[in-house]
């Protein structure tokens, strides 16, 4: 818990439609979010974390092919498009992780025999891409009015060779890391919805990273709320 307290002390405290940049007293890069950017999807959002940017579009609930129909809930699909080229193994893996997270919070039983499709376009990848994809997906689902039991966010942690924890790492920090851990958490109880890891770490380091991610999630959810409040107060 000591590691979590240290991490929490270094987190952002002022958030809004755009948050402050990373500084010696801030462990997260700056955030920015804009919703309702695209006309064709039912909901859309652009999410920026530092220089990592993802554009998300949500289609549905809509009619679904009989072959994909699920009688008691909506069929949820996630499509991730890289900045350049065709989707590969990494994109397919991230699609599965984002889909699993969305399925854990979307109230699909309210729209049986329909489809909800989340399309993610990578605009730029400067580290913590999966976390940014999760955050963009959440804000696009909110914009589309898809019913959810809670919001969710993604947080990436990196452990360097000395065991130091870095939240929201850049590409350079990821390359130098001994381990990279990404968590998806809900807004109701900071409950763990999904986790994926790469590299070597101890059980104690895993718990330290999870505690730091849970602390960081509170600030991301505050950013969500203030971003939404600013948007709807203008309309």
Swiss-Prot record:
Classification from the root reads: Eukaryota, Metazoa, Chordata, Craniata, Vertebrata
| Record-linked PANTHER family | EXOSOME COMPLEX COMPONENT (PTHR11953), EXOSOME COMPLEX COMPONENT RRP46 (PTHR11953:SF1)
From the Swiss-Prot or TrEMBL record, state where the protein is found: Nucleus, Nucleolus; Cytoplasm; Nucleus
Q: What is this protein called?
A: Exosome complex component RRP46
Q: Which GO terms describe its biological process?
A: defense response to virus; DNA deamination; mRNA catabolic process; RNA catabolic process; RNA processing; rRNA processing
Provide the assembly information.
Answer: Homodimer. Component of the RNA exosome core complex (Exo-9), composed of EXOSC1, EXOSC2, EXOSC3, EXOSC4, EXOSC5, EXOSC6, EXOSC7, EXOSC8 and EXOSC9; within the complex interacts with EXOSC3, EXOSC8, and EXOSC9. The catalytically inactive RNA exosome core complex (Exo-9) associates with the catalytic subunit EXOSC10/RRP6. Exo-9 may associate with DIS3 to form the nucleolar exosome complex, or DIS3L to form the cytoplasmic exosome complex.
Main subcellular location = nucleus
Keywords assigned by UniProt? Cytoplasm, DNA-binding, Exosome, Nucleus, Phosphoprotein, rRNA processing
What would be an example GO MF term here? Answer: DNA binding
Q: Listed GO cellular component terms?
A: cytoplasmic exosome (RNase complex); cytosol; euchromatin; exosome (RNase complex); nuclear exosome (RNase complex); nucleolar exosome (RNase complex); nucleolus; nucleoplasm
- In the UniProt record, what gene is named as encoding this protein? Exosc5
Please state which protein family the record places this protein in: Belongs to the RNase PH family.
- Please describe what this protein does: Non-catalytic component of the RNA exosome complex which has 3'->5' exoribonuclease activity and participates in a multitude of cellular RNA processing and degradation events. In the nucleus, the RNA exosome complex is involved in proper maturation of stable RNA species such as rRNA, snRNA and snoRNA, in the elimination of RNA processing by-products and non-coding 'pervasive' transcripts, such as antisense RNA species and promoter-upstream transcripts (PROMPTs), and of mRNAs with processing defects, thereby limiting or excluding their export to the cytoplasm.
Residues recorded as bearing Phosphoserine in the entry: 20, 23
**Chain intervals with Polar residues compositional bias:** 12-21
Region described as Disordered: spans on this chain:
1-21
Spell out the Pfam families in the cross-references: RNase_PH, RNase_PH_C
Q: Which organism is it from?
A: Mus musculus (Mouse)
């Amino acid at each position: 818990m000591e590691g979590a307290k240290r991490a929490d002390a270094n987190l952002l405290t002022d958030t809004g439609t755009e948050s402050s940049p990373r500084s010696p007293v801030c462990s997260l890069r700056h955030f920015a979010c804009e919703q309702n950017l695209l006309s064709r999807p039912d909901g859309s959002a652009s999410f920026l974390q530092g220089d990592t940017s993802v554009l998300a579009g949500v289609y549905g609930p809509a009619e679904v092919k009989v072959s994909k129909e699920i009688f008691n809930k909506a069929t949820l699909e996630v499509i991730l498009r890289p900045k350049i080229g065709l989707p590969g193994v990494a994109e397919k893996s991230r699609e599965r992780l984002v889909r699993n997270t969305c399925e854990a919070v979307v109230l699909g039983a309210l729209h049986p025999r329909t489809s909800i499709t989340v399309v993610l376009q990578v605009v730029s990848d400067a580290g913590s891409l999966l976390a940014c994809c999760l955050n963009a997906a959440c804000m696009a689902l909110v914009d589309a009015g898809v019913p959810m039991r809670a919001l969710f966010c993604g947080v990436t942690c990196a452990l360097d060779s000395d065991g130091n924890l870095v939240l929201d790492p850049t590409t350079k920090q990821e390359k130098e890391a001994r381990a990279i851990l990404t968590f998806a958490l809900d807004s109701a109880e900071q409950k763990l919805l999904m986790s994926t890891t790469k590299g070597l770490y101890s059980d104690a380091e895993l718990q330290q990273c999870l505690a730091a991610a849970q602390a960081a999630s509170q600030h991301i959810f505050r950013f969500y709320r203030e971003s939404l409040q600013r948007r709807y107060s203008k309309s």
